[in-house]
């Protein structure tokens, strides 16, 4: 999110980045986190910002977009930008996760994968989620194959997405959604399904890209940047209602 944060700050926005519980240096706690922990973190940040700043815009990418949608249904702000919003996978297994977490509690996601850490994209992805690994250590691929994740964590992601879909019908603030046409994670048809449930005004833009829309080295970056900055420039602060 840093390139976008810097672009917004250069336009005069006060920017606050948010690291969700269980990510970054807190990764060891990820298996024990729940969807409510992530949503509460976003909501608390909005509670702090809303009295001091206006307009207030929330920007979320991937699962963060779904969490943002849920949060703004509870805390009124002025605008929401969702980039590559991930809220569910169109697979048979997805709605079965509550059952699967009881039958197969542990998953080794990289057990059968060929992990080539000489590939810059592979290094980039793994270092984003596992900042403490050494990609140059020849033992790292073997260690990653032993890495275990509880199925329950994926079920919490499912719960967060379901909550976002249900919240969409209650949100009326302006919304920008940027979707990669080649995104295999947050698939375009799933994003369009989510937006059909949204109650407020929607600006929807598809770009020729995959899931990572914030890589400043990719050709699509300038387009994404321009879309968000233009959307932000049109927002007007909504008066805070004191009850």
Regions found by a protein language model. Name each.
Residues 63-147:
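Alpha/beta-hydrolase-fold enzymes
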Residues 149-168:
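Active-site nucleophile elbow and catalytic-triad environment of alpha/beta-hydrolase enzymes
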Residues 209-223:
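Catalytic histidine-centered segment of alpha/beta-hydrolase-like enzymes
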């Amino acid at each position: 999110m840093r390139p976008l944060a810097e672009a917004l700050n250069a336009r005069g926005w006060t920017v606050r980045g948010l690291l969700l519980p269980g990510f970054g240096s807190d990764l060891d706690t990820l298996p024990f986190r729940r969807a409510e922990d992530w949503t509460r973190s976003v909501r608390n940040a909005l509670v702090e910002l809303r009295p001091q700043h206006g307009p207030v815009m929330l920007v979320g990418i991937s699962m963060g977009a779904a969490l943002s949608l849920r949060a703004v249904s509870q805390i009124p702000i002025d605008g929401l930008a969702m980039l590559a919003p991930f809220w569910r996978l169109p697979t048979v297994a997805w709605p079965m996760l509550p059952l699967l977490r009881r039958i197969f509690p542990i998953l080794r996601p990289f057990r059968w994968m060929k992990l080539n850490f000489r590939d810059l994209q592979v290094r980039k992805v793994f270092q984003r989620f596992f900042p403490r690994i050494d990609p140059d250590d020849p033992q790292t691929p073997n260690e990653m194959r032993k890495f275990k994740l509880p199925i329950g964590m994926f079920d919490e992601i499912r719960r967060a997405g379901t909550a976002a879909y249900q919240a969409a019908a209650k949100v009326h603030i302006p919304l920008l959604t940027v979707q990669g046409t080649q995104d295999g994670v947050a698939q375009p048809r799933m994003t369009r399904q989510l937006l059909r449930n949204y109650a407020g005004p929607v600006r929807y833009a598809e770009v020729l890209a995959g899931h990572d829309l914030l890589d400043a080295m990719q050709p699509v970056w300038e387009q994404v940047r321009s879309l968000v900055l233009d959307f932000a420039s049109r927002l007007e602060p909504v008066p805070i209602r004191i009850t």
